[in-house]
Amino acid sequence: MKTIKTIIAAALFLFGAQAIADEGTVRVLMTTSQGEISIDLYLDKAPVTAANFLQLVENGDMDGGSFYRVVTYENDRGSPKIEVIQGGLGDASEGFEAIEHESTEQTGILHTDGVISMARGAVGTASTEFFICIGDQPGLDYGQPRNADGLGFAAFGKVVSGMDIVRKIQGLPADGPTESDYTKGQILTQPVSIGRVRRAD
């Protein structure tokens, strides 16, 4: 009986994953205090990561989040240096379930200009925090040295409108408090609020 239940559960999971992938690309609109950003989520290419973000959107969990960190070639202390803006729920992210890591090798979504990807510490710890690439950032892809484990970050979509807003956010003053020398000069003095994120279709 237990085996049958396991088979049924696995079948339902696969059916759900296929249903998500069948949606292909879903566009979401992110309204911030600096302007609007439109993002395409690639559910067919990154079904786990994109579906997680879409679920956060549909649940209203991303509403009230913020962009709080900006990384430039001048203030970055990693190697290779990158340029991104990071956002999400920040301290409010506790309690959200982490997701499986989908590498760029699996999805084929590379970290090019405008690509949105999940921030993480160890593999399999990503949940609500994300970043948007400014310019091409190949050092964030699978097999590259930016992350010590070599697995890169999980890209899952791309900005299709509003990169001017992304760059505007990156240029804001960043002398906010931080407990880490690594992020000194990267924390926005005034975080950019995310008022609402919703499906555009």
Language-model segments: what does each one mean?
Residues I8-L14:
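Hydrophobic helical h-region of N-terminal Sec-dependent signal peptides
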Residues G16-D201:
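Cyclophilin-like peptidyl-prolyl cis-trans isomerases
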